[in-house]
A protein has these predicted regions:
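Short, intrinsically disordered terminal tails adjacent to the first/last structured region
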Residues: 1-2
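A short acidic, Gly/Pro-enriched loop at the edge of an enzyme's catalytic core
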Residues: 147-157
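A short SAM/SAH-binding and catalytic strip from SAM-dependent methyltransferases
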Residues: 156-169
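Class I (Rossmann-like) S-adenosyl-L-methionine-dependent methyltransferase catalytic domain
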Residues: 8-92, 99-146, 168, 173, ...
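A short glycine-rich, Lys/Arg-flanked "PGG" loop and its adjoining helix->strand segment in the class I
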Residues: 172-184
Length: 267
């Protein structure tokens, strides 16, 4: 009979082997979806290739891609409205970690008078955005600062499902950089994995003790870089990271599905 320790070791090996095979088969799956799927974009929007959709949502399903993007665009407006702000009143807005435009596709369509910008670490995604979202400006950023923007250029920066993946070193590097590109009084909207996510698993006591825990995802290993995996943190820990650079206005639990949101102001 297998002991508990031996069983856990065997299970890890089987899981690692399965995910290694899974990653090898992914390019074939992406090609088949692009070649034979009849998935289409909503009117007026463009459909990114399956490979890019998967890197953003871990799914090639076009309906889910657009559904999540529309829901995120709505959630941004709700969080802002709860603190008395209207998205249409902002002049220059940056999508930090825009990917292949899952959210920006909807926002630029709904708010054409806003000057939209997007930046991401993936050149292929930015290339696609430049070709398919001509109303916005796009840049490629490195894994660490700086961004290719002047000081005080934006009155709103949002980063949805970015700090859910960055390790603490990278988070602490990016927070002052996001402050730099914001105007005085500008807003930063971040999402993160809140207590309702990490409090149900083995990570709960460690997150409570340390404030933040970074986990390498078996599914994302080899697909995403080592510093961009899965991060759990307490609201107080993120508030502490922001406090030297921003005034936190609001913490909204489960504002973006399974992610919490923090809205902060550059003073």
């Amino acid at each position: 009979m297998l002991t508990h320790g031996v069983f856990k070791q065997w299970r890890r090996r089987v899981s690692a082997a399965f995910h290694a095979l899974y990653r090898k088969l992914l390019p074939i799956h992406w090609w088949l979806v692009d070649r034979f799927s009849k998935q289409v974009a909503p009117p007026g929007l463009a459909l990114p290739p399956a490979r890019l959709r998967f890197q953003v949502t871990q799914s090639t399903n076009a309906w889910l891609f657009f559904r999540f993007g529309r829901r995120t665009a709505q959630d941004i407006q709700i969080v802002l409205a709860e603190s008395g702000y209207s998205l249409g009143n902002f002049q220059n807005v940056l999508d930090f970690g825009c990917g292949c435009g899952r959210t920006l596709l909807w926002l630029q369509s709904g708010f054409p008078k806003v000057n939209w910008s997007g930046t991401d670490v993936h050149p292929e995604m930015i290339e696609w955005c430049r070709a398919n979202i001509p109303s916005a400006r796009f840049t490629i950023n490195a894994a660490l600062p700086p961004l290719e923007y002047p000081d005080s250029g934006f009155d709103l920066v949002y980063a949805v499902s970015v700090f859910t993946h960055l390790n603490e070193e990278y988070q602490r590097a990016w927070i002052p950089e996001l402050r730099r590109v914001l105007k005085p009084g500008g807003l930063l909207l971040l999402t993160f994995h809140g207590e309702h996510v990490w409090n149900v698993g083995d990570d709960a006591s460690e997150v409570e003790r340390q404030g933040i825990v970074f986990r390498t995802s078996t599914k994302l290993r080899g697909i995403m870089p080592h510093w961009y995996q899965t991060t759990f943190q307490t609201p107080s820990h993120l508030r502490g990271s922001l406090s030297a650079h921003f005034t936190v206005i609001r913490h909204s639990s489960k504002a973006f599905g399974d992610q919490d949101a923090i809205l902060a102001r550059r003073d």
